[in-house]
């Protein structure tokens, strides 16, 4: 008899799990040296794989898990139940870190992990509409309790707006053709499923483009997902907020999955790792000194073994930094 497929939470292999933990660990040590119990934020909790590994390894660690996806939060809660005395799980978007910490009475943290993009749970749950590989309602919301859906976007945005988001968020060179086709098709019948959208995209993207760019709908789906969830706007607010929350010696680790995400992460971390002294200033005052020390040379990527275990990790790019000076005054 064939075994039934394991639930997504059991199949899930956390991306770069050991490397993430090893990068965060010195931040926990720094807290202990200051006589404090270490506190870490998993800002994109997902199914809790990274968090579970950290809680198992560090018995004194307190975890704050944040996720906008209520289903993921519930599954992670079950997974992390043995550690419930050392966890706070919060339904929020990760740019709300300052509010979450204020509500919990936490003033600073020892580390923060961000694993960006769409989760395995969201990709595997057909009805969520994130995947172009099977037909499903055209939704794509990470938080299904609020906000516009992907169907709302493709059925209501004008052609110029569609071109803009598909080109900007999807980096799709056929954005004009795709937007034009979407507008024409919805005039006959509004889009309701992913399959309908994939069919229209296939009709205008040259077959040869798939050889180098993957599935013809890949970039458009990425663009719609980013638009629906305001992912890059959230990220631009979240990374600075995360850095501001770090205690001395605390560390931030971020995994991104496409160049738009990585560009934002790189900009913030590198910007905060440089002197802010005005050009030509004769001395570097304390408040001008770098706040962060970069811990990774460029980006780190998964090994071939890790990719074999989890093919979705192939595009992961990791950056990390450590706080070496108190936050800048506003």
UniProtKB/Swiss-Prot annotation:
Broad enzyme group: transferase
Keywords, sorted A to Z: Cytoplasm, Methyltransferase, rRNA processing, S-adenosyl-L-methionine, Transferase
Record's catalysed reaction(s): cytidine(1402) in 16S rRNA + S-adenosyl-L-methionine = N(4)-methylcytidine(1402) in 16S rRNA + S-adenosyl-L-homocysteine + H(+)
Top-level taxon of the source organism: Bacteria
Residues that hold S-adenosyl-L-methionine according to the record: 48-50, 67, 101, 115, 122
Alphabetized Gene3D superfamilies for the sequence: Putative methyltransferase TM0872, insert domain, Vaccinia Virus protein VP39
UniProt subcellular location: Cytoplasm
Any GO MF annotation of the entry: rRNA (cytosine-N4-)-methyltransferase activity
Enzyme Commission identifier(s): 2.1.1.199
One GO BP: rRNA base methylation
A Pfam family of this chain: Methyltransf_5
Gene Ontology CC terms: cytoplasm
Function (record text): Specifically methylates the N4 position of cytidine in position 1402 (C1402) of 16S rRNA.
Family: Belongs to the methyltransferase superfamily. RsmH family.
Protein's UniProt name: Ribosomal RNA small subunit methyltransferase H
Organism of derivation: Pseudarthrobacter chlorophenolicus (strain ATCC 700700 / DSM 12829 / CIP 107037 / JCM 12360 / KCTC 9906 / NCIMB 13794 / A6) (Arthrobacter chlorophenolicus)
Protein encoded by which gene: rsmH
């Amino acid at each position: 008899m064939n075994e039934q497929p394991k639930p997504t939470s059991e199949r899930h292999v956390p991306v770069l799990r050991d490397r993430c933990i090893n990068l965060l660990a010195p931040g926990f040590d720094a807290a202990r040296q200051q006589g404090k119990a270490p506190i870490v934020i998993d800002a994109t909790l997902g199914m809790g794989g990274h968090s579970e590994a950290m809680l198992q390894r560090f018995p004194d660690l307190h975890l704050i898990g944040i996720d906008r996806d209520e289903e993921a939060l519930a599954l992670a809660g079950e997974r992390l139940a043995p550690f419930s005395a050392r966890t706070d799980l919060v339904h929020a978007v990760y740019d709300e870190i300052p509010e979450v910490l204020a509500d919990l009475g936490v003033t600073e943290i020892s580390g923060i992990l961000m694993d960006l993009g769409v989760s395995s749970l969201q990709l595997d749950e057909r009805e969520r509409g994130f995947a172009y590989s099977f037909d499903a309602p055209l939704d794509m919301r990470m938080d299904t309790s609020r906000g516009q859906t992907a169907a709302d976007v493709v059925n209501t945005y004008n052609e110029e707006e569609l071109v803009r988001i598909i080109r900007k968020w999807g980096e799709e060179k056929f954005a004009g053709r795709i937007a034009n086709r979407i507008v024409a098709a919805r005039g006959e019948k509004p889009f309701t499923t992913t399959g309908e959208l994939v069919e229209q995209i296939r009709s205008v993207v040259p077959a040869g483009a798939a050889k180098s760019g993957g599935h013809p709908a890949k970039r458009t789906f990425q663009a719609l997902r980013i638009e629906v969830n305001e992912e890059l706007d959230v990220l631009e607010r979240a990374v600075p907020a995360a850095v501001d929350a770090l205690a001395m010696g605390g560390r931030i680790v971020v995994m991104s999955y496409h160049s738009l995400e990585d560009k934002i992460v790189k900009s913030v971390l590198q910007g905060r790792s440089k002197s802010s002294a005005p050009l030509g200033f004769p001395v570097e005052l304390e408040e001008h000194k770098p706040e962060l020390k970069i811990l990774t040379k460029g980006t780190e990527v998964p090994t071939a073994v890790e990719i074999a275990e989890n093919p979705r990790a192939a595009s992961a790019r990791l950056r990390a930094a450590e706080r070496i000076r108190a936050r800048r005054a506003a």
